[in-house]
Amino acid sequence: MGQKVNPVGLRLGINRTWDSRWFANKGDYGTLLHEDIKIRQMLLKQLKQAAVSKVVIERPHKKCRVTIYSARPGVVIGKKGADIDKLRKKVADMTKSEVFINIVEIRKPEIDARLVAESIAQQLERRVAFRRAMKRAVQSAMRLGAEGIRINCSGRLGGAEIARLEWYREGRVPLHTLRADVDYGTATAFTTYGTCGVKVWIFKGEILEHDPMAVDKRMTAESEGPSSGRPPRRDRDRDRDRDRDSAA
């Protein structure tokens, strides 16, 4: 039977890049990799209420830079920055190096695959009907600009005796198109009947330039707020002069 490859891993180096961005020699690589795993586990556990989408770790010389993508940056920072100082100290104890923590706000959590999957999983744990939770997530994503979305829920849905898989899809989700910006996220709901798995694919459009940092740049631009949509003055003047020359 054909299986679906992870859309994020398939597009690494094309329009996506790695969440751990550093180089190490053979002796240190394994140690640093396990450090990254422990840092992510600790942050996701500590910031369960902060709607964290992903954690990017960079390691300049004898330093560690952690970037947290969150829909609720206020929860991460805490009152007068107290919570973020505690996190910085914990990460510094784990890495034994100087730590910098940056926070990037996710303006549209409804079209972030991981956050959508976590939201559906939390609703399943609260005994919300799975069809209602899935339909609501699909409608919200399409309303906020997604070009397509697919949601899979599997397990003993609604307390059924036999586990099954239910899915909804709206729009198009091209998994084979490498230039497509397809976000993918998973979550697990721990119910009284057992665990239910949630998978979400969200298609946000095509990225035509070959830039591994394209997705990160788009997320950062969205967090900084909406732009006016007008090109810089130099470009406008150049376009106006070109139109005038062609008319002449």
Swiss-Prot record:
Residues 232-248 have a biased composition (Basic and acidic residues). Keywords: Ribonucleoprotein, Ribosomal protein, RNA-binding, rRNA-binding. Residues 214-248 are annotated as: Disordered. Part of the 30S ribosomal subunit. Forms a tight complex with proteins S10 and S14. CDD domains: KH-II_30S_S3. Residues 39-107 form the KH type-2 domain. Gene3D superfamilies: 3.30.300.20, Ribosomal protein S3, C-terminal domain. Binds the lower part of the 30S subunit head. Binds mRNA in the 70S ribosome, positioning it for translation. This is Small ribosomal subunit protein uS3. It holds the Pfam family Ribosomal_S3_C.
